[in-house]
Swiss-Prot record:
SUPFAM superfamilies: Ribosomal protein S10 (SSF54999). The keyword Ribonucleoprotein applies. Pfam families: Ribosomal_S10. Involved in the binding of tRNA to the ribosomes. Belongs to the universal ribosomal protein uS10 family. GO terms for molecular function: structural constituent of ribosome; tRNA binding. Part of the 30S ribosomal subunit. It comes from the Bacteria. This is Small ribosomal subunit protein uS10. The gene is rpsJ. Keywords: Ribonucleoprotein, Ribosomal protein. GO terms for biological process: translation.
Amino acid sequence: MTGQNIRIRLKAFDHRILDASTREIVSTAKRTGASVRGPVPLPTRIEKFTVNRSPHVDKKSREQFEMRTHKRLLDIVDPTPQTVDALMKLDLAAGVDVEIKL
């Protein structure tokens, strides 16, 4: 896999789980002999929802909720076959969404 990069994009609602998963991927890649660029923190997506507090009246009384999606980007430069195998066998936290592009 010479001259090829692996781009890994991670998404999660909890930044602590996301950072732990990022550290795990970086240590696995470095242990197998690949060099890593990143992690690059991408902009956090904030979705806000505004709802009425009461079911019937009082339009002025509202409540706001927000959902934050944290993102990180990793580039693994010149991965070895051992790196690819180790990344496939890696078990990450349940709340982390992983997108891999070759």
